[in-house]
Amino acid sequence: YQITGDTEFNEIFLSDVRIPHENVFGDVGGGWAAAVTTLMNERVALGGGVPKQGTGPIADLMHIWEERKGSLDDVSASVMRDRISELWIQAEALRLTNWRAREASKSGNPGPEGSVGKLMSAEMNQKIYELCMDIIGPEALTFEAGYERNRGDGSSWARSSLKYSFLRSRANTIEGGTSEVMRNILGERVLGLPGDVRVDKDINWVDVPRN
């Protein structure tokens, strides 16, 4: 189980599998290039959406703010408005960046732009739902993981709650490539920075020394 009470992931092990030559995807020995292309498309799917302005996670934040702002003192409300304004600007910058990336990717060859969107959206989602938890205060501690309530068909009672979204957002910087991996990609492929030292770069996988 995940911290949300969901079970979204599993491992599959295949033994003695042989792939017919006619089913080879891409060039023989070029599997990594195919895998990287797949990952680029996944990252675009995870972080490259172009929603309408003010929708998605930022809409959740605005809704809970409108609902709870009256319970805050003037100083706390002022601090919250500053934090909300900053996140709204980031959300709009991400939306427009994704729009430009989508236009650039219509050539059919996804580039590192997907890593930009994935990195920004993952970290922004976490910041948004962290702020939501700050707004609701101690109520944030009352979420039940719902192991016995998740019916296994994706219709868990908790899926629409802010507390569920906060817990689920913790995975955003891991799935589809960690934020650390995204920064490496952007540093090396976009900014042209020197790559990490790799002593196994020109060694076949089967020949890489293992403990």
Model-derived features with residue positions:
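Glycine-rich beta->alpha junctions and the first turn(s) of the following alpha-helix
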Residues: 1-97, 172, 206-211
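A general structural signal for short secondary-structure junctions and capping/turn motifs
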Residues: 2-6, 133, 164, 177
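Flexible loop/turn segments at secondary-structure boundaries
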Residues: 5, 21, 111-112, 182
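Active-site lining segments that contact anionic ligands and/or coordinate catalytic metals
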Residues: 9, 58, 91, 111, ...
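Short, well-ordered loop/turn and helix-capping segments at boundaries between secondary-structure elements
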Residues: 15, 19-20, 41, 67, ...
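Glycine-rich phosphate/cofactor-binding loops in nucleotide/flavin-utilizing enzymes
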Residues: 29-51, 140-211
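C-terminal helix-coil-helix/basic helical segment that borders enzyme active sites and/or dimer interfaces
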Residues: 74, 78-81, 92-154
